[in-house]
Amino acid sequence: MKIIPAIDLQNGEAVRLYKGDYDKKTVYSKNPLEIAQKFERMGATDLHLVDLDGAKIGQTRNLELVRKIKDETRLKIEIGGGIRDFDTVRMYLEQIGVERVILGTAAVEKPDFLKELLIKYGPSRIVVGVDIREGFVSTSGWLEKTSLPYLSFLKKLERIGVKTTIITDISKDGTLTGPNFKLYDEISKENSLNVIISGGVKDNSDIQRATRSDFYGIIVGKAYYEGKINLEKEFRNAN
């Protein structure tokens, strides 16, 4: 199972939101590159980046910072937030050279666009982030709740050819109360998608629980920044 540390970017800083609320933000570092390099020294192989500015307005805002992190580490980077057109995808995958892009809003609103990307780049490089609030998919940086039930949407993604999804329970994100394993277990039973858990990780026991259930991956953010989890130990165990 992949253990993927996360850095959320806003105005060039590393931040975390509480339950996706842009007004409830904690700044953890003014130098996200240093954090990425620290993750690499600890034994991380992958890095989850979110451009929160991009997610909110639909345009990339931390591009040069992402490029710098890619150039100055050997981490396999996945990036999401504001990726809603072909030029942005091409820039990330072909120019900057990140390993994976994460589509959220675009996957909901433009399924034909998603299909084109899957054909051109393959499902290993196109990941869909499914953000869930009260049983429905949310978009636009979690600010808009759709009328789309999450299981129906996941079935649709599977039919289109998506292989990997990052599933976030918004009500858990940034709360340090543990992931919604009931939700993730249900999703795993209902389809064959690779499921990456995101939101609510509180300590090492959550990583161990996810490993036992054979999920594809788990994203760790606030639990690390608040000193609740020993990531170096988990990286050693994973390798």
UniProtKB/Swiss-Prot annotation:
EC code: 5.3.1.16
Effect of G227K: In strain: IL1403
Active-site residues, record numbering mapped to chain: D8 (proton acceptor), D131 (proton donor)
Catalytic activity: 1-(5-phospho-beta-D-ribosyl)-5-[(5-phospho-beta-D-ribosylamino)methylideneamino]imidazole-4-carboxamide = 5-[(5-phospho-1-deoxy-D-ribulos-1-ylimino)methylamino]-1-(5-phospho-beta-D-ribosyl)imidazole-4-carboxamide
UniProt-annotated location(s): Cytoplasm
Keywords: Amino-acid biosynthesis, Cytoplasm, Histidine biosynthesis, Isomerase
Alphabetized InterPro entries for the sequence: Aldolase_TIM (IPR013785), His_biosynth (IPR006062), HisA_bact_arch (IPR006063), Isoase_HisA-like (IPR044524), Isoase_HisA-like_bact (IPR023016), RibuloseP-bd_barrel (IPR011060)
GO biological process: L-histidine biosynthetic process; L-tryptophan biosynthetic process
One GO location term (cellular component): cytoplasm
Name of the top EC class for this enzyme: isomerase
Molecular function terms from GO: 1-(5-phosphoribosyl)-5-[(5-phosphoribosylamino)methylideneamino]imidazole-4-carboxamide isomerase activity
Pathway(s) the chain acts in: Amino-acid biosynthesis; L-histidine biosynthesis; L-histidine from 5-phospho-alpha-D-ribose 1-diphosphate: step 4/9
CDD domains: HisA (cd04732)
Family classification: Belongs to the HisA/HisF family.
NCBIfam families to which the protein is assigned, alphabetical: 1-(5-phosphoribosyl)-5-[(5-phosphoribosylamino)methylideneamino]imidazole-4-carboxamide isomerase
PANTHER family: 1-(5-PHOSPHORIBOSYL)-5-[(5-PHOSPHORIBOSYLAMINO)METHYLIDENEAMINO] IMIDAZOLE-4-CARBOXAMIDE ISOMERASE
Name of the featured protein: 1-(5-phosphoribosyl)-5-[(5-phosphoribosylamino)methylideneamino] imidazole-4-carboxamide isomerase
Lineage of origin: Bacteria, Bacillati, Bacillota, Bacilli, Lactobacillales
Gene name in the database record: hisA
